[in-house]
Amino acid sequence: MQTTFTELMQQLFLKLGLNHQVNENDVYTFEVDGHIQVLIACYHQQWVQLFSELGADLPTNDNLFGEHWPAHVQGRLDGKSILWSQQSLVGLDIDEMQAWLERFIDDIEQRKEPQNTKFQPNSTSPILFI
């Protein structure tokens, strides 16, 4: 028997030890450390969708078919950068859902990391000047 979206979300939040928060449109809210918010919804009871607002100052990215599957797509909505992803509800189990959500959150954290802090040489790092 196929798991419904509501059952999948209840299992996910139970497994993570969290109270599930859902609004009237069946959109679940998942918060990480108070600085990342992921919205989880299901489109036409067929496509599970993850969505997060990245902020206004992030450069666009072309990761349409990047390193993740399902793909994490960065775009713009109402003047803000967003990240979204979707995959079929059919065959999606609790472990796959959790792994997908974790990869999505990791991707958000990497994209929100300031560009100037990605590489900071220390005193032992060899630096080549030409």
Swiss-Prot record:
Main role? Functions as a specific chaperone for YopT.
Q: Which superkingdom is the protein from? A: Bacteria
Under InterPro entries, the record lists: Tir_chaperone
Protein name (record): Chaperone protein SycT
Mutagenesis / variant outcome for changing residue 81 to P:
In plasmid pYVa127/90
Q: How does it assemble?
A: Binds to YopT.
Q: Which GO terms describe its biological process?
A: protein secretion by the type III secretion system
Keyword list (alphabetical) reads: Chaperone, Plasmid
